[in-house]
Amino acid sequence: MAQKKKSSGSGLMSSAGLMTYYDADKKAIHVQPKTVFIFGAICGIVILAFSAGFGLWP
């Protein structure tokens, strides 16, 4: 049977790259999932209200 070769450096390089990416990501805007859910619910309610108000309700 053929044996698989283990690459010793690929895992370390991969994790180091991810750590660098997440360190740089700290400057980004962070939004909580609850905020996104509430914003989506409000947008949905507003769209339904406009649809009902203009006679487009199914």
UniProtKB/Swiss-Prot annotation:
The keyword Transmembrane applies. The chain crosses the membrane at residues 33-54. Pfam families: Sec61_beta. Residues 1-32 are cytoplasmic. One of its GO terms (biological process) is protein transport. It is found in: Cell membrane. It comes from the Archaea. One of its GO terms (cellular component) is plasma membrane. Its main location: membrane. InterPro entries: Preprot_translocase_SecG, SecG/Sec61-beta/Sbh. Keywords: Cell membrane, Membrane, Protein transport, Translocation, Transmembrane, Transmembrane helix, Transport. The keyword Ribonucleoprotein does not apply. It is a single-pass membrane protein. Residues 55-58 are extracellular. Involved in protein export. The function of the beta subunit is unknown, but it may be involved in stabilization of the trimeric complex. Component of the protein translocase complex. Heterotrimer consisting of alpha (SecY), beta (SecG) and gamma (SecE) subunits. Can form oligomers of the heterotrimer. Belongs to the SEC61-beta family. This is Preprotein translocase subunit SecG. It comes from Methanococcoides burtonii (strain DSM 6242 / NBRC 107633 / OCM 468 / ACE-M). The lineage of its organism: Archaea, Methanobacteriati, Methanobacteriota, Stenosarchaea group, Methanomicrobia.
